[in-house]
Amino acid sequence: MKDPIRKLDEPRSSVATKPLRRVVAALILRGEGPSREIFICQRRAGQPMGLKWEFPGGKIEPNETSEEALARELEEELAIHATIGPLITTIRHTYRNGGAIEIEFFLVRDFQGEPVNRIFQQMLWSPFSALPDYDFLSADLTLIRDLADGKLL
């Protein structure tokens, strides 16, 4: 006999429900006006979603605030000491594999040191208008459009 009819809002048993992962990311800016740029990073080829572009950041550890997590991640990934600015936006995204992520994006205008590439394939400063030219993670695509269109920052 076939399985009983399943309501559409009930999860399929074959798709594992994964816990929501909370992460933080930095929108690091330099310059002013039309010449301002934003810092972006490309994942290494061997990583999950390899060679996709993203903003630097990472997971929030237990007992850590979002701002503490972002400052720690920027030190670990880029060797910079950043002053974490205001929260710009929060995005929730569910990937095709069932993984769900909540990303808090913070503005960073002030930091000490020059970014050092500790974990990425490549890193660069991009004009806002060029952001759609890069192959970003799907969770970032709405933000990328808003930044390129001048709707944020």
Where are these regions (language model features)?
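Active-site-adjacent beta-strand/loop module that shapes the phosphate/pyrophosphate-binding cleft
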Residues: 81-82, 89-114, 122-124
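Generic C-terminal helix-cap and adjacent flexible tail
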Residues: 148-153
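NUDIX/MutT-family hydrolases
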Residues: 107-109, 115-147
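Short secondary-structure boundary/capping segments
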Residues: 18, 45-46, 95-98, 114-117
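Conserved N-terminal beta-strand and adjoining loop/helix that marks the start
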Residues: 3-39, 59
